[in-house]
From Swiss-Prot:
Lineage: Bacteria, Pseudomonadati, Pseudomonadota, Alphaproteobacteria, Hyphomicrobiales
Subunit structure: Homodimer.
Organism field: Brucella melitensis biotype 2 (strain ATCC 23457)
Keyword check for ATP-binding: yes
Designated name of the protein: ATP-dependent dethiobiotin synthetase BioD
Domain of life from the UniProt record: Bacteria
Length: 212
């Protein structure tokens, strides 16, 4: 079976999509964003296609495309629809698959289901993206507890931002989790800069061959 990985995060806007693009490029993976909230600006699928330099065949269509950039449950309500998680089936691919959640781990899909609940059903190894800034210890440890309470397999934590050695070490130790690496913030972000930075700061063997 090919690698299948979930990319989730401690919060929205922390860099999951940029990390996902780097990971897709490194693995030659297919990308899938099940729920896209907000269509006026460049979507996450479009960002990944550009930064990963991925062909259209490697960017799968979203299961739900919602107009308002908000939590999926609210965005769906404003569009007059309800997200039905039971209808979201993991696509079969011949290549590795990277699945990116929307917002943070506990973002609601509807009035009953959180993204974490869907991940618990899928049981695919998940990468938790976390800031390296002040406050991230609490956010990251809480997210890890939420994942483990649902038996979501945790591959490790990917930090995003400026280096904070003590914070990263503390999270790895207290969270009993693998520290996968840290993706620094990049000025004038380009595909080439992103690919080079990922290769310097992560070990591809930590991601390759992971399957459930």
């Amino acid at each position: 079976m090919n690698s299948r990985l979930i990319v989730t995060g401690t919060d929205t806007g922390i860099g999951k999509t940029v990390f996902s693009a780097a990971l897709c490029h490194a693995l030659g993976a297919v990308y899938w964003k099940p729920v896209q909230s907000g269509l006026e600006e460049e979507t996450d699928s479009e960002i990944v296609a550009r930064l990963a330099q991925a062909s259209p065949q490697r960017i799968l269509p979203e299961a739900w495309r919602l107009n308002t950039p908000a939590s999926p449950h609210l965005s769906a309500r404003l569009d007059g629809v309800e997200i039905r998680p039971e209808e979201m089936h993991i696509p079969a691919t011949s290549l590795p698959l990277v699945i990116e959640g929307a917002g943070g781990l506990l973002v609601p899909l509807n009035d009953k289901t959180l993204f974490a609940d869907l991940f618990a059903i899928w049981r695919i190894p998940a990468i938790l993206c976390a800031r390296a800034a002040l406050g991230t210890i609490n956010h990251t440890l809480l997210s890890l507890e939420a994942m483990r309470s649902r038996d979501i397999p945790v591959l490790g934590v990917a930090f995003i931002g400026e280096a904070n050695e003590d914070t990263e070490t503390t999270i790895a130790h207290l969270g009993r989790v693998k520290r996968l690496g840290r993706l620094p913030l990049l000025d004038d972000l380009s595909p080439e800069k992103l690919h080079h930075s990922f290769a310097r700061n992560f070990h591809i063997d930590d991601f390759a061959g992971v399957a459930r």
